[in-house]
Amino acid sequence: MSRKDGVLALLVVVVWGLNFVVIKVGLHNMPPLMLAGLRFMLVAFPAIFFVARPKVPLNLLLGYGLTISFAQFAFLFCAINFGMPAGLASLVLQAQAFFTIMLGAFTFGERLHGKQLAGIALAIFGVLVLIEDSLNGQHVAMLGFMLTLAAAFSWACGNIFNKKIMSHSTRPAVMSLVIWSALIPIIPFFVASLILDGSATMIHSLVTIDMTTILSLMYLAFVATIVGYGIWGTLLGRYETWRVAPLSLLVPVVGLASAALLLDERLTGLQFLGAVLIMTGLYINVFGLRWRKAVKVGS
């Protein structure tokens, strides 16, 4: 990977890591489902008038939009709104990698290798440590924690739809898929917000919207979604997947660091242990025992 593309990849990692802090800031003055609906409305409009619709079956596009866009962010925004720390959310959301592996095995008959099973087992242990900390110390609201896991599972379901879309005969451009799939969750978000929050709350949040919320929406829509996914998709198309995908492991590192610096969030001892176990599980899933093999060859 060239130095320029390496810098771009790290830029996306930082942008996505900060994403969780921005969500928490944006939720201070707006209901979570309303904020999510406005985010995707800004992603879709006016870009949808300038980007061609991806030539994929409508049922796959709907499935992708309802899982990776609607369900994932409905659960994630509500989780953070209910007290899930932004930094910890950035880490727990990475459970999507393991959900994706298990769904891939079930849906496509993909074989699970030893390193994947070891990574999954270690990450599950890390999640159980976090649950234990939540139940005993109440440092993390259990509802927020479970909603974040639901968001991770929804992301994994979206990955399965994405795999089906990308294996289609007419493989769509990344930006086309991002923008057109953003159209799908807008109405569901607003309807859900209307049911759960009420029209008075929705109208009040729009009438009293402040610059902080506006900037949060701009960041979430244009920087994190359009710019972030645009660069990431370009890099995936330019290089082998194994060169690009592992860099996403740095997202929760940035998420935890930025939450500590900007929101003064601190991990308890058990939370830190759970975080280390999950990150180690992710590392094993991606790299396996490659480091150990390299040491043997070198010696």
Curated annotation (Swiss-Prot):
Localization annotation: Cell inner membrane
Bilayer-spanning residue ranges: 7-27, 32-52, 60-80, 88-108, 117-137, 141-161, 176-196, 217-237, 244-264, 269-289
Cytoplasmic side: 1-6, 53-59, 109-116, 162-175, 238-243, 290-299
Domain EamA: from-to ranges: 14-132, 153-287
Periplasmic side: 28-31, 81-87, 138-140, 197-216, 265-268
GO molecular function, one term: efflux transmembrane transporter activity
Protein name, per record: Probable amino-acid metabolite efflux pump
Organism annotation: Escherichia coli (strain K12)
